[in-house]
Curated annotation (Swiss-Prot):
Function statement: Redox regulated molecular chaperone. Protects both thermally unfolding and oxidatively damaged proteins from irreversible aggregation. Plays an important role in the bacterial defense system toward oxidative stress.
Gene giving rise to this polypeptide: hslO
Keyword Zinc: yes
Protein known as: 33 kDa chaperonin
Tagged with keyword rRNA processing: no
Pfam families in alphabetical order: HSP33
Domain of life: Bacteria
Protein's cellular compartments: Cytoplasm
Keyword entries, A-Z: Chaperone, Cytoplasm, Disulfide bond, Redox-active center, Zinc
Any one GO cellular component localisation term in the record: cytoplasm
One of the protein's GO biological processes: protein refolding
InterPro entries noted in UniProt: Heat_shock_Hsp33, Heat_shock_Hsp33_C, Heat_shock_Hsp33_N, Hsp33_helix_hairpin_bin_dom_sf
Amino acid sequence: MSDLPDTDFTQRFIFDERDVRGEWVSLDDSYAAVLARHEYPQPVQVLLGELMAATALLVGAMKFDGLLILQARSAGPIPLLMVECSSEREIRGMARYEADQIPAGATLSQLMPDGHLTLTIDPVKGQRYQGTVDLDGANLSECFTNYFVQSQQLNTRFWLNAQGGKARGLLLQQLPRDRQPDDEEREDSWQHVVALAKTLKPEEWTEGNETLLHRLYHEDAVRLFDIQPLRFNCSCSRERSGNALVSLGEHDAKALVDECGGTVEIDCQFCNERYFFDASDVAQLFAGGGTDVASETRH
C-alpha cells in the first residue's frame, strides 16, 4: 500500500500478536484553517495544534454520537485553549493569550501555570460527561498520558507534534488481556511498542503514516483500518448569535444595542466571523421573526 496523500484523517491500527491498539492522526488543512483565522504566536500555534491532534485521536478512539470538547485553562499567559470535534469529525479550535507575555521557547508550565484540562462529551442523546484533571506534565503529550492512565486504568501513551503548519498525533493503548495472558509477556510487549515509538525524530512526524508505522513496527504484524477523514468546520451561525441576544431578554438586548451605538457585533472566537444586529434586527428577534433579515455578516 502507498502512503496516503497529505490530508486530514485518523487511522486506527492494531497489533495482531499483541494486546495493543493504536491510532494515528494527520491534520493539515484543518489546522491551517484555524491558524489562518488568527495571528497566534508560535508557542500558541504549537499547543493549539497539539490539542487539535489529541482531540481528533480521542474522537477516533471513542464510540459516541455528539461533540467532544477539550479545554485547557490556566491563570497564565495562555488562559484558554479549546478544541471541539464532532463524531462526524468536524473540528475547530481557538486560543486566548496575552501577546506580551509569551516568549519564544516558553514551556507548558510557563505558559499555563497551575492549569487544568477538562474533557467534555456532549452526546446527541443521553447525559453529558465531564472530567477535569491538572495539567500534570512537561508537555501536552504527558498530560494526556497521565489523564488516561488515571481514568481508564490501562497503559496509554500519547505523542503529539505540531510544526510547519501540520499537526500529528500517535496514541498507543494496551488492550484488556486477550492474546497475551501472561503478565510479564504483556508488560514486555507494551514496553516494546512504546520504546519504538520513542525513537520518532521531530523531522519524521510529517512523513506518510504508512512509511512511519512501517519504520517503527516492520517486525510486527500491524493491521491498518480504513482512514476516517476530518475537516475544519465552524458551527457558528447568525441564528445562534441571535439566540444569544434573545437569552439576554428583550430589555437588556435593546439596551445593549443602544450602548453599542445602534449595532451590536457578535464575534465567533473560533473562525472570526462577525455578526451584526441593529435595532430592527433585535425587534424582529423578539417578534418571533428569526434572523432572516440580516445586517452584515463579515469575516
